[in-house]
């Protein structure tokens, strides 16, 4: 059990038989009445976001989420197969479990898989990945004066905005959290 006074962003709790991750929280002390904690919670199974108030000091069960390092192996139809780095056990993941990270999956990439009661509830990708540019329009001399950008299709099929000087075949570092170009690799 954890007190609502100890809430912090990223903490995983159980509320109404569901598992939630705290996205935002705020301690509120009104002029009249008891203090409370206003939270924004994300359901780890459905991805839905809900707001909820907890009384100050209210005890809430902490969800014991296990994080295992796994390696992404290959795509099999609608499923993505990952292997546990310690036990070599394979786990099948759906696109919904991976979320937007599907665009950046590359074979042999290490992932953090989150389990709750033996069920996959989420996937943590590395913060950055190195991907090759599969297609982009060639930059024209003088384009860089404005510091603009152009779309580039990466080897995984993801489309990102890149500076004009980036050409096909170059390897780029991409931030998986925002989907933005960081720099050349």
UniProtKB/Swiss-Prot annotation:
Pfam families the UniProt entry points to: EFP (PF01132), EFP_N (PF08207), Elong-fact-P_C (PF09285)
GO function terms (MF aspect): translation elongation factor activity
Pathway(s) annotated for this protein in UniProt: Protein biosynthesis; polypeptide chain elongation
GO biological process terms, semicolon-separated: peptide biosynthetic process
SUPFAM superfamilies on file: Nucleic acid-binding proteins, Translation proteins SH3-like domain
Any one Gene Ontology cellular component term annotated for this protein: cytoplasm
Localisation per UniProt entry: Cytoplasm
InterPro entries associated with the record: Elong-fact-P_C, NA-bd_OB-fold, Rib_uL2_dom2, Transl_elong_fac_P/YeiP, Transl_elong_KOW-like, Transl_elong_P/YeiP_cen, Transl_elong_P/YeiP_CS, Transl_elongation_fac_P
Keyword Cytoplasm: yes
Keyword Cytoplasm set for record: yes
Keyword annotations of the record: Cytoplasm, Elongation factor, Protein biosynthesis
Record family assignment: Belongs to the elongation factor P family.
NCBIfam families xref list: efp, PRK00529.1
Primary role: Involved in peptide bond synthesis. Stimulates efficient translation and peptide-bond synthesis on native or reconstituted 70S ribosomes in vitro. Probably functions indirectly by altering the affinity of the ribosome for aminoacyl-tRNA, thus increasing their reactivity as acceptors for peptidyl transferase.
Protein name (Swiss-Prot/TrEMBL): Elongation factor P
Source organism: Desulfitobacterium hafniense (strain Y51)
Gene: efp
């Amino acid at each position: 059990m954890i007190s609502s006074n100890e809430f912090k962003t990223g903490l995983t709790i159980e509320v109404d038989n569901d598992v939630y991750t705290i996205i935002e929280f705020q301690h509120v002390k009104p002029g009249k009445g008891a203090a409370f904690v206003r939270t924004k919670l994300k359901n780890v199974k459905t991805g839905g976001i809900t707001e909820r108030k907890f009384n100050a000091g209210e005890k809430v069960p902490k969800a014991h989420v296990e994080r295992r390092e796994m390696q992404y192996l290959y795509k099999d139809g609608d499923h993505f197969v990952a292997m546990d780095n310690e036990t070599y056990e394979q786990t099948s993941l759906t696109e919904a479990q991976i979320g937007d990270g599907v665009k950046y999956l590359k074979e042999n990439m290490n992932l953090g898989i989150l389990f709750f009661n033996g069920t996959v509830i989420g996937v943590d990708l590395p913060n950055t990945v190195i991907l090759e540019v599969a297609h982009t329009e060639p930059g024209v001399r003088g384009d860089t004066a404005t510091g603009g950008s152009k779309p580039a299709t990466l080897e995984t099929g993801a489309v990102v905005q890149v500076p004009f000087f980036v050409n096909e075949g170059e390897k780029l570092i991409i931030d998986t959290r925002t989907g933005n170009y960081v720099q050349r690799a």
